Amino acid sequence: MTRGRVIQVMGPVVDVKFENGHLPAIYNALKIQHKARNENEVDIDLTLEVALHLGDDTVRTIAMASTDGLIRGMEVIDTGAPISVPVGEVTLGRVFNVLGEPIDLEGDIPADARRDPIHRPAPKFEELATEVEILETGIKVVDLLAPYIKGGKIGLFGGAGVGKTVLIQELIHNIAQEHGGISVFAGVGERTREGNDLYHEMKDSGVISKTAMVFGQMNEPPGARMRVALTGLTMAEYFRDEQGQDVLLFIDNIFRFTQAGSEVSALLGRMPSAVGYQPTLATEMGQLQERITSTAKGSITSIQAIYVPADDYTDPAPATTFSHLDATTNLERKLAEMGIYPAVDPLASTSRALAPEIVGEEHYQVARKVQQTLQRYKELQDIIAILGMDELSDEDKLVVHRARRIQFFLSQNFHVAEQFTGQPGSYVPVKETVRGFKEILEGKYDHLPEDAFRLVGRIEEVVEKAKAMGVEV
């Protein structure tokens, strides 16, 4: 282990000088461990990551925790390898920080646990799986209109309080229950309170045992927020490559990854690019996203919450992310206000998998007809608001009649919300979803009341609900 000394501290950026011309490699982890000698000093156990080489013997590094108490001249040890984090079964049900240290007060990780470096190349071309396979989620609106691809990347857009977290939890639950799959949750620049709430909600709903969680909260230095997504990804890669699993990787929020990179870039002295972002924005995003893929062994499907600054979709941060996405799930506040959960906008959500050669001709035609019906209903809403239903043609009245039933049938109860609603959740296979909507479009259930379609699973449940309401079926 080669030793060096701190020669400069600039917030989260630390310069270290090594003797005898030794220069640690880029991305190497350096350790500073210092015991307080008097009451004016603090105990320090800090990890730095090498970012730049300055001359023959000096490196500029990014701190993974606060640099409070660092003094010039402190000893630094080169570990000779990048930051490495625990992987495998030991991570399930646990909460970690960027360095792979447990932060859930549930005890230490076994010393003999396998650890993998967080910086790794993306899978080679010949290792990639080429066939497109749909990931069934059991959530009707997603499976019908914006299906997820195994090994794909999904963007989840939504403001506060429209149900992003509940949708994420339900996806984790369904993948664990129906597919026996593993989930990894990476909280990037998260509010600590939200991360804490999510952890306890997952404990209560019983999905924590199939989940590993990694957090780099808002209050942490930019180095931690920039690398925590890679920590989560490394844990997910182990389950894909070594165990052949289909893994779900949640990143909340991918914008904070870019934001942290921008802060670090400025501190490293790089010339800023458009809108003040780092010049390496596309490269950093590509290095992360290219590792999220399907291989012949297994897949990592990622669902990324995306914050759009000032609702400007042309901002370089969201615009760079969009180019990597296979599907988008847009949550709409108006639908949440109507009590339609999940509040997924059926017209704004998209997926490249919604094509006849991938989902099949019947599924494709039903999905497109559902969207056409809802789009026509949307166009008619202004007329209805001003003149009322009576002024519509018979054809348009039928469109509205069916569109409202479709809109309500796109809602369903979630397993993870059962403790709040008192209603059991439903998992609906894709075939059942397509059949249900096809029959509604054919007018088979025009005689049933709208409320019978609200928050149910399969189409048979609509009939049962209508019977319970005293309607002749």
UniProtKB/Swiss-Prot annotation:
Functional summary from the UniProt entry: Produces ATP from ADP in the presence of a proton gradient across the membrane. The catalytic sites are hosted primarily by the beta subunits.
Enzyme class: translocase
Family affiliation: Belongs to the ATPase alpha/beta chains family.
Topology of the protein relative to the lipid bilayer: Peripheral membrane protein
Coarse class of the protein's main subcellular location: membrane
Subunit structure: F-type ATPases have 2 components, CF(1) - the catalytic core - and CF(0) - the membrane proton channel. CF(1) has five subunits: alpha(3), beta(3), gamma(1), delta(1), epsilon(1). CF(0) has three main subunits: a(1), b(2) and c(9-12). The alpha and beta chains form an alternating ring which encloses part of the gamma chain. CF(1) is attached to CF(0) by a central stalk formed by the gamma and epsilon chains, while a peripheral stalk is formed by the delta and b chains.
Protein name as catalogued: ATP synthase subunit beta
Subcellular location: Cell membrane
Organism from which the protein derives: Geobacillus kaustophilus (strain HTA426)
Reactions the enzyme catalyzes: ATP + H2O + 4 H(+)(in) = ADP + phosphate + 5 H(+)(out)
Swiss-Prot/TrEMBL keywords: ATP synthesis, ATP-binding, Cell membrane, CF(1), Hydrogen ion transport, Ion transport, Membrane, Nucleotide-binding, Translocase, Transport
This protein's GO CC annotations: plasma membrane; proton-transporting ATP synthase complex
Record InterPro entries: AAA+_ATPase, ATP-synt_VA_C, ATP_synth_F1_bsu, ATPase_a/bsu_AS, ATPase_alpha/beta_chains, ATPase_F1/V1/A1_a/bsu_N, ATPase_F1/V1/A1_a/bsu_N_sf, ATPase_F1/V1/A1_a/bsu_nucl-bd
Keyword Ion transport set for record: yes
Keyword flag Lipoprotein: no
Pfam families: ATP-synt_ab, ATP-synt_ab_N, ATP-synt_VA_C
Signal peptide interval: none
Lineage: Bacteria, Bacillati, Bacillota, Bacilli, Bacillales
Residues that, per the record, bind ATP: G158, G159, A160, G161, V162, G163, K164, T165
Known EC number: 7.1.2.2
